[in-house]
Amino acid sequence: MIGLIIIVVIVLVALLLLFSFVPVGLWISAIAAGVKVGIGTLVGMRLRRVSPRKVISPLIKAHKAGLHLTTNQLESHYLAGGNVDRVVDANIAAQRADINLPFERGAAIDLAGRDVLEAVQMSVNPKVIETPFIAGVAMNGIEVKAKARITVRANIARLVGGAGEETIIARVGEGIVSTIGSSEHHTQVLENPDNISKTVLSKGLDSGTAFEILSIDIADVDISKNIGADLQTEQALADKNIAQAKAEERRAMAVAQEQEMKAKVQEMRSKVVEAEAEVPLAMAEALRSGNLGVKDYYNLKNVEADTGMRNSINQRTNQKDDESPDK
């Protein structure tokens, strides 16, 4: 009796270990769905540290949708770090939309960091990207701001390695600025905003990107400010400041030159005073040496007195002329 109890306990423990190690419920679900999966396959997944549910559940979903996938394909993608369920959903959506998307390509897109399911949905339902206001200056100096709506469709063939939405927005912005800048007058942009769309769309801006541009529509156009007039005003102000600086420089040089001339005048006056101080000494020396007689000395004094008297008369005459009113 005791031996029978031990055998029953061993069997129960074995069954418990089996059910905990092997997802029997998942295996039954797969068999019920018509997916042939062996117990050994599930055990092998456990040994390879693969969650059987994350492989078998997408496999059942794919089988029901009519996709011919294998456990090896799904397990390989799982081990590579991919999202198996999302790739299978993308394959099912692509099949329903009649889009050619092999599992290997979908797996590559998923491993590249792209949302493959969203890409398939964008291929069916295009996405609208709205740009911020982009400013450009027309030839007459008026700044014009334009906002565009870009309708794009995902290009599944270029999802791996193709540029994203930021590149599309940057290229469209560059095209808008170029088109506005080539307009002779800002009114041309206001009257025909569709010219911007046509010009930008004709440049093939979706080259090298993961999208195909379907249309570019100008949503809004605004007049900002007169950049040309502002630049002219700033240039005039700069020229004025330069002229004032040069005038101030010339004035400073003139003042410096005037002060220099005054210093030279004072220097010459000091030399004259110094020379006049030596005249009496020279006359005394001439008298002592006999080169100048007493008579000559008095004649010189008379000439000096006569010259001083004439200068005094001339000064009084000039003062009277200045004080008399003009006739």
Swiss-Prot record:
Pfam families, from UniProt?
Answer: FloA
Feature: compositional bias, Basic and acidic residues: 318-327
**Source organism per UniProt:** Staphylococcus saprophyticus subsp. saprophyticus (strain ATCC 15305 / DSM 20229 / NCIMB 8711 / NCTC 7292 / S-41)
Per the record, the major location class is membrane
Q: Could you describe the subunit structure of this protein?
A: Homooligomerizes.
Function summary: Found in functional membrane microdomains (FMM) that may be equivalent to eukaryotic membrane rafts. FMMs are highly dynamic and increase in number as cells age. Flotillins are thought to be important factors in membrane fluidity.
The membrane-topology field of this record reads: Single-pass membrane protein
Q: Does the keyword DNA-binding apply?
A: no
- List the InterPro entries hit by this protein, alphabetically: FloA (IPR022853)
**What keyword terms does UniProt attach to this protein?**
Cell membrane, Membrane, Transmembrane, Transmembrane helix
One GO location term (cellular component): plasma membrane
Full protein name? Flotillin-like protein FloA
Query: Where exactly are the transmembrane stretches of this chain?
Result: 2-22
* Subcellular localization: Cell membrane; Membrane raft
Q: Region annotation Disordered: residue ranges?
A: 305-327
**Stated family:** Belongs to the flotillin-like FloA family.
